[in-house]
Amino acid sequence: MRWILHGVLFVALAAGVFSLLPRLGGLTRDASGLRHARPAFIVAAVVAQAASLGCYAQLYRRILAALGAKVRFRLAADVVLASFFVSHLTPFGSATGTLVNVSTLEADGIEASTTGEGIALTSLMSTVALIVLFGTGFVATAGRHLSRTYLTIAGVALFLVVAVLAVVFAVGAHPAIAGRAARRLARVARRFRPGIDPEQAAQTGSRLASLARSALSGRAFLASFGFASGDLLFDLLSLDLMFLALHYQPGFGPLAVAYAAANIASAIPVTPGGLGVVEVTLVAITVGFGAPRATAVLAVLGYRIVNYWLPLLPGAVAYLRVRLRSAKAGPSRPSAG
């Protein structure tokens, strides 16, 4: 029953986003411009999106290898796509996606704790790459004639993300600090969730910081950061290609700022996969940088079809594959002991 309710809400939300945004953009008279869209750029956007997902699978695979758990690329890609499928179909779906991830790799002999650590470190690297992308985009917009309001807001945002990045590296370099920070956060969280153990949280925080120091240092860090950046840049390229398909080029700076801001906003688990949040943020910021509203709405909706909806098809196939894999591995576990 809960899955049916989630499905109804999901369809209603998607229908609302994809029907309301065109009206807000005044597309009833401008949608005829789609006839002049360049198909080659749309196909290239799909290819860029596939490359983005491949980079993310390689990032996850690289992190797991640094933790001592080696998996084939095919399995890593299946896990990523299956987790994507689940997390993008249910509210607060990241928890369900994590369970799919853990159970699949357990069937391959990887402990749940290692998988959890791999997921956390993968998210950390993606966050670092996203912050760097935002800062780069902000610097790239420095020569533009922008409103004082934008410069003030963007300046504050840049200061905050740099501060967060500094805190992340400081905590990662000192496991004791990470443990104390986790303990304090757990004490605050225990007011809302009494079952949270601050000491256990402190141990987990210290362990993750130690793992980050060992697994994400030197060449391992450069390789992981490269794959994380590749994931974001190919995804950003997919968005840019959608604009180019409609004969408009926003420029790297504005697009990077809009993209990073949309991804940061989508981290708040209001809707599955940031549905609605990403679209509105991308349209608002690109229009603020001078993009025609109708073009921005069409490009963003096209990008989200490629970025959000299209991967659900291989995601469904991957989900069935990993479920069958787990089911086959289940009966054989007792005999393995």
Question: Where do the language-model regions lie?
Answer:
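Short helix-coil transition sites and intra-membrane helix breaks within transmembrane domains
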Residues: 51-58, 63-65, 88-99, 267-278
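Membrane-embedded helical hairpins/re-entrant loop segments and their flanking transmembrane helices
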Residues: 55-82, 243-258
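Membrane-interfacial helix-loop connectors
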Residues: 67, 243-268, 272-302
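Transmembrane helix-loop-helix hairpins in multi-pass inner-membrane proteins
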Residues: 1-27, 32, 83-195, 275-337
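Hydrophobic alpha-helical transmembrane segments
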Residues: 4, 8, 42-46, 73-78, ...
